[in-house]
Amino acid sequence: MIEKSKKIQSDILTFINKYKDHQTERYESDFNQLVMRIFAYQFQNNLPYKKFAQLRHKNLLTVKNWREVPLIPIQAYKELILSTEDINQAADVFYSSGTTNINHRSKHYISNLNIWEESMRAGFKKNVLPNTDKIRILSLFPGMADNPNSSLSRYISTAIREFGTENSHIFFENNQLNYSELIVALQEAEKNHEPILLLGASFSYVHLLAYLQQHHQSFNLAKESIIFDTGGFKGKSKEVSMTDLYADLESTFKVTREQIINMYGMTEISSQCYDRNLMDHSENKTVYFDKIAPAWVKTQVLDTETLQPVAQGQRGLLAYYDLANWDSCVSILTEDIVIKNNHGFTVIGRAKGSVAKGCSITADELLQLQ
């Protein structure tokens, strides 16, 4: 098992580095072969997932390609331990925020951080910083030191370590955002015409904008600056439309919509999707704001009732096939409703009511999986 695990990890890293910038004619075949190997490994070493697959009459003989790999509902990460490796030897474990029930959170065991970090670096470089290697990063969200079991906090700490200049800084410490120090840093960057990457969760910006408005402050950021946003308003007491949020960011920081990028990620997956606008702009293409997946991730948009792929322009549940999830579940059915289009996908919101129930695991199934 150990040797097979090492070989799979090595081949995933090779795949990421081979296809992170462009795809060749062998890409589809290579992706399919690797997914099938990962599925076989998970079927043999992740017992709850094996039982789940068998309940759906899926096994190593019946699954013929990556589209047929059984999609584990994302809710399962709350109910089950989904790992091919010994969780006592895990390099890290990520917990979801648990905004509604802190004792009922998703848990994602990461046996080896090499693939997680390589996936993060490759995706970030291509989609966020296509034209530069380093930038001053100002974070509104805590890093690993203050939030050790958060995948987003590890993401932020990794971004600063790999892509941040020496004067990059995390301004969220001791459970609060240090507005005064952040404003000093923003004023300094404005004065020196220094490009910055302002990085935060969606709700962080709501609080920051309210504070700046209250104190009658705004900034004229350098034109190469980027505002990086992730998440949404799930479980928050106040919700703001993303259109309104981005309009406020544009006016407060004197940036264009093309300078604002949103990242799609979650605890249960190991790779992220991004708005494509910065990449499109860097390649002198028509700029779109749809989300795209990296080469080591494939997505499908599935009908909420039949779970069959929808046509272009239709909405459905997002299915996520992530090679970097080699040690848990390679294929996940999210609860996010998205629209499929020619340039990627657009997130509409979370599934609700009967739709959410339809993409979850029943209590009876849970008893059989444990």
Regions found by a protein language model. Name each.
Residues 1-16, 29-41, 134-136, 149, ...:
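Active-site glycine/GP-rich loop and adjacent strand/helix microenvironment
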Residues 49, 120, 155-156, 245-249:
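Generic structural signal for hydrophobic residues
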Residues 25, 41-95, 103-109, 118-130:
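Active-site diphosphate/adenylate-binding microenvironment
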Residues 19-22, 73, 217:
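Long, charge-rich alpha-helical interaction segments
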Residues 1-21, 55-59, 121-127, 147:
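Domain-scale activation on soluble regions of proteins
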Residues 99-100, 109, 116, 120-175:
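Internal, well-ordered alpha/beta segment that forms a basic, Gly-enriched binding/recognition surface
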Residues 22-30:
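Helix-loop segments that flank and shape redox-cofactor active sites
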